[in-house]
Amino acid sequence: MQRDYWYTVARDGNLLDRMVDVGRTAAERTIRRLGGQKLKTCKVPVLFSAELAGGVIGNLMAGISGGNLYRQSSFLLDHLGKQIFPEWVHIHEQPLLKGGMGSGAFDGDGLQTYVKDFIKDGVLANYLLSTYSGRKLGMPSTANAGGARNLFVDSNAGDQKALLKQMGTGLLLTELIGHGVNIVTGDYSRGAAGFWVENGEIQYPVSEITIAGNLKDMFMQLQAVGNDVDRRGNIQTGSLLIDGMTIAGN
């Protein structure tokens, strides 16, 4: 037996997907997972589908949040101004975007929000600070009490099909299970399911595996960001192709 899901979110009700389309997508995603196989333990490139990619970027934001930093509970402590991604990576906040899922003119402290870079040319350009956490760190607030608003990860590649071709052989991830991310150390280990890919083509579904790595390594080994952006949340990113993650299976 297999299961999957799909959903639709929009600020404007007229932009919601039709119920029949949501149901059909959920059914199609479930059916294609039938016959899932285990993999032998290996180290291969991993493509995080767009709906999962936002979680990886969310781990970044947890690592640069003021609360974790002043408690010295972050793997990115003292990394401001340092290279943590390849030079082409750009991650920025657009809090005043009309119709954006996370738009807001003011943060939780009442400070006016503004456009800013968090990652520019691969370098950590800003922490994520409220008035309180900024004071604890001896730094000004970045007007991010309550978190980031409308975070964008710029694409440097095509859609998911193009990224599969670029990957060649590896794992396409479509589900992550559990909460095995340690923000203090950056260690990353989660149950997963998806599809085995060879020569850029999906071969068969896989299940009952674990993917593992370290967020610092994952960030630096980012190979591509797709243009297949999942626009349903506060973090807007396409699929993420990351080189050399460990897959634990049989």
Feature-to-residue mapping (PLM):
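Dual-mode signal for accessory low-complexity, basic/Gly-rich regions
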Residues: G23, L77-N250
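Mature, solvent-exposed C-terminal subdomains and processed small-chain segments of exported/organellar
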Residues: I64-S74
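Intrinsically disordered, low-complexity segments enriched in small/polar residues
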Residues: R3-Y5, N68, A125
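Internal alpha/beta scaffold segment
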Residues: M1-L60, I64
